[in-house]
Each structure stands twice: as C-alpha cells, then as structure tokens.
Regions:
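Extracytosolic (periplasmic/ER-lumenal) interhelical loops and adjacent juxtamembrane/interface segments
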Residues: 37-76
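Small-polar-interrupted transmembrane alpha-helices in polytopic inner-membrane proteins
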Residues: 16-30, 87-148, 169-180
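Juxtamembrane/interfacial segments flanking transmembrane helices
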Residues: 35-42, 155-163, 213-221
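C-terminal ends of transmembrane helices
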Residues: 2-5, 91-100, 154-161
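Function-critical hydrophobic alpha-helical transmembrane segments in multi-pass membrane proteins
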Residues: 61-99
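Membrane-interface helix caps and helix-loop-helix hairpins in membrane proteins
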Residues: 125-135, 161, 184-192
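C-terminal transmembrane module of polytopic alpha-helical membrane proteins
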Residues: 1-27, 33, 105, 179-234
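Alpha-helical transmembrane segments that form the membrane-embedded catalytic/substrate-binding core
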Residues: 82-91, 137-148, 190-212
Length: 234
C-alpha cells in the first residue's frame, strides 16, 4: 500500500466525527427514556428538526429563512434507537471506504450537500402537497446518497439484507429505490419520509455527475471501476 493511502487510512476520520455528533445529540432521547422527562428532547426537536406546516406555533422554516439552519441540524437527530443504529451502521460500513478514496473534505462536502438538498426537496414536496405538522429528522437522505456512491465503486460487494439474505450492492440499490417509491406512492402512514430517501439517491447521482464527473449507474452496471488490490473494501 502506498504512503498516500496509508496517510488517508491513519488520518482523522470525518465519518467517525459524524457518528459521534449523532450519538451525542441522541442523549436527550436517552434521558427522556430513563427519567421520563422530555423537556430537553422537546427543545431539541422543536429547534433542531425540519418543521413544516406548523404555522407560528413552533420555530419552522415556514416562518422565515432564519430557521433555515434546520435543513442541517435535522440531519443529526433521530427519533429512536433503531433509527440511529441503522443509519450510523450504514454510514460507517459504506462511508468509510468512500472517505478513504475521496479524502475527508470531499466526503464531508458530499454528505452535507446531498443531505441538505434532500431536505430542501422534501420541504418543497411537503409544502406543495399541503402537508401539515411534519417534522423531518434523520440522516437517511445523506446515507442513501452514500449507499449509491458506494455501489458505484464496489458494485459486486455482497451485504446481508435483513442480516440474512446475501445480495450484491448493485442489486440492493435499485431494490431500495423501488421499495421507497412503492411505499411513497401507496401513501403508507408509517411515519417515515420515504421521499427524502429517494431524494438522497437523486442528489447523490447528480453530485457524482457534476463534481466527480462519473455516472454512478453506468459505473455500477456497465463499466465498473477496476479497484486496486490495495484499496479493496474490507
């Protein structure tokens, strides 16, 4: 392995930092669960979630751009332990190889831009469809973008779907996309913003086209990247 790859491997990890921030911001949820005092959690969600259609009752991006920060802060909040664990596990598994390949700065830019654009598109979607009292939280939009980019570099890698079924990443990506689209179109009231997941895929695709100058779908299925032996995914 060359010195450049060694430097990237041993240097500061932005993926680890993102995971730490998400876990720290989950502490109010833990305190609420243990003490049954939801005051801190309520404040965190009131100011940190991307709130849509609440009128003037709580801080909301509807009420002015001064609350636009919610497009960012909502990416670091999670509604329950499973939500946090699944997102952070996926971020670690799929994000680490991308950070090693791109470098921390490029990975952070990709993660934040894709996540924020997915939130902006979700805000417009819910606003234009007349949705009321919607609070968006979670890193899923950005994480779905990470999954798409990972698939472009490592399409043949197998993962265990539901920790049971072995499936190549290049088939997992379209399976997730079809599933999210189906759930969104059938109007499932499961409390999950499936449209945000789809926007994560879309903006990751656009980001790869514009910034990295490659088509992730073409690379995934028609012209796979030849991965150097020293850079194989582990």
């Amino acid at each position: 392995m060359n010195n450049r790859v060694l430097l990237k491997s041993n240097s500061f990890s932005i993926v680890n930092l993102i995971i730490i921030i998400n876990c720290v911001l989950f502490i109010p949820w833990v305190l609420n669960y243990v003490t049954h005092n939801g005051a801190l959690l309520g404040l965190e969600f009131m100011f940190g979630a991307l709130n849509i259609g609440f009128g003037d009752s709580i801080p909301s991006i509807d009420n002015g751009f001064q609350f636009g920060y919610q497009l960012l802060t909502s990416m670091f909040l999670h509604g329950n332990l499973a939500h946090l664990i699944l997102n952070m596990y996926a971020l670690y598994a799929f994000g680490k190889p991308l950070e090693k390949r791109w470098g921390s700065g490029h990975f952070l830019a990709f993660y934040l831009v894709v996540g924020i654009l997915a939130n902006i598109a979700s805000y417009l979607f819910f606003s234009l469809t007349g949705a009321e009292r919607v609070s968006l939280i979670g890193a899923s939009g950005a994480v779905y973008g990470v999954l798409l980019a990972f698939g472009a570099y490592y399409p043949e890698i197998k993962v265990l779907l539901f920790f049971i079924i072995p499936l190549k990443i290049k088939w997992l990506v379209p399976l997730f996309a079809i599933f999210e689209l189906f759930i969104e179109m059938t109007g499932s009231a499961d409390g999950i913003a499936h449209i945000t997941h789809l926007f994560g895929f879309i903006f990751a695709f656009i980001y790869c086209l514009i910034v990295f100058r490659f088509n992730p779908i073409r690379r995934m299925y028609f012209s796979p990247l030849i991965v150097d032996e020293n850079e194989r995914y582990r």
